[in-house]
Amino acid sequence: MTNIRKTHPLTKIINNSFIDLPAPSNISAWWNFGSLLGICLIIQILTGLFLAMHYTSDTATAFSSVTHICRDVNYGWIIRYMHANGASMFFICLFLHVGRGLYYGSYMFTETWNIGITLLFAVMATAFMGYVLPWGQMSFWGATVITNLLSAIPYIGTNLVEWIWGGFSVDKATLTRFFAFHFILPFIISALAAVHLLFLHETGSNNPSGIPSDSDKIPFHPYYTIKDILGALLLILMLTLLVLFSPDLLGDPDNYIPANPLNTPPHIKPEWYFLFAYAILRSIPNKLGGVLALIFSILILAIIPLLHTSKQRSMMFRPLSQCLFWLLVADLLTLTWIGGQPVEHPFIIIGQLASILYFMILLVLMPIISIIENNMLKW
């Protein structure tokens, strides 16, 4: 009798994706982040669902409803902080996942890579709108500043901003629609993640060497299921430690002050995971130029496959490219630091230099160094 796992239409999909899937024998812990992102998404959807049961998307009661969740709802505080810090864990995993893709040349699977970029944009949009919902000072002013950037679009900009706001400022209509979008987007992300996996399974996974591994595959279960469970346990441990010991470590104290349109906070800044893009935005004195640089700082990932000039796929055997990659990581950390600093000397010039370096590495230095490495190897 044939195993039902391999014949039933539903279990067959699960079997071919998570059990009998042929996987490279040498993929390292850097390949764990896909499953960790799936776990993060599930945590966010579940905690978000329970928060939505008690939250009210009205300017008069939004802040109070969040306070009510933390004070009066059974274990409401843990649900709220799991959700807030879960977003941080989500972005840590995202950045490491994208970094792995850049380092090992996984971007050569262009369909998978492009859906990944779409997912990144969707998660960033979701996180931004979620940050607005508690209706604290940073929620209100963050929403005002970021949505206002659209007014830089020639001709239609002002109308577009007022259309998104649902009025002439960030108000009740804005909060209500942001809540609606924040609720629906994770389900769209889930569907996109399924398509991401679909395209990945068309080609099979890449591996650290960047060499095709068709001749040496092992079943996903039990080898990588065990490995993923270990990663999941470490992720949950880190999240639990963060939630129980320092839940406000990554948040902004200003968000404990109810939103007040008449009082601007001294330093308006987004959550830590947007600071690198915010620094790039601020480093350009022109509004439209800043917005374009902001968008392109993420969209640049889409042209990475076109800029791949190396004869090797992975950076595993390319020390010069490795040096450039880690310079890029250091540059992004510098941008993250600058994004959280006030707009004054010397932070302005450091931010501008770091922004130039970011685009220089990806657009100019990486392709040139790859060609030099090809010549050094006489390829």
Swiss-Prot record:
Pfam families: Cytochrom_B_C, Cytochrome_B. GO terms for biological process: mitochondrial electron transport, ubiquinol to cytochrome c. GO terms for molecular function: metal ion binding; ubiquinol-cytochrome-c reductase activity. A ubiquinone binds at residue 201. GO terms for cellular component: mitochondrial inner membrane; respiratory chain complex III. The keyword Electron transport applies. InterPro entries: Cyt_b/b6_C, Cyt_b/b6_C_sf, Cyt_b/b6_N, Cytb/b6-like_sf, Cytochrome_b, Cytochrome_b_C_euk/bac, Cytochrome_b_N_euk/bac, Di-haem_cyt_TM. Heme b b566 binds at residues 97, 196. It is a multi-pass membrane protein. CDD domains: cytochrome_b_C, Cytochrome_b_N. Binds 2 heme b groups non-covalently. The chain crosses the membrane at residues 33-53, 77-98, 113-133, 178-198, 226-246, 288-308, 320-340, 347-367. Heme b b562 binds at residues 83, 182. It is found in: Mitochondrion inner membrane. Its main location: mitochondrion. Its cofactor is heme b. Keywords: Electron transport, Heme, Iron, Membrane, Metal-binding, Mitochondrion, Mitochondrion inner membrane, Respiratory chain, Transmembrane, Transmembrane helix, Transport, Ubiquinone. Heme 1 (or BL or b562) is low-potential and absorbs at about 562 nm, and heme 2 (or BH or b566) is high-potential and absorbs at about 566 nm. The cytochrome bc1 complex contains 11 subunits: 3 respiratory subunits (MT-CYB, CYC1 and UQCRFS1), 2 core proteins (UQCRC1 and UQCRC2) and 6 low-molecular weight proteins (UQCRH/QCR6, UQCRB/QCR7, UQCRQ/QCR8, UQCR10/QCR9, UQCR11/QCR10 and a cleavage product of UQCRFS1). This cytochrome bc1 complex then forms a dimer. Belongs to the cytochrome b family. Component of the ubiquinol-cytochrome c reductase complex (complex III or cytochrome b-c1 complex) that is part of the mitochondrial respiratory chain. The b-c1 complex mediates electron transfer from ubiquinol to cytochrome c. Contributes to the generation of a proton gradient across the mitochondrial membrane that is then used for ATP synthesis. This is Cytochrome b. It comes from Mustela putorius furo (European domestic ferret). The gene is MT-CYB.
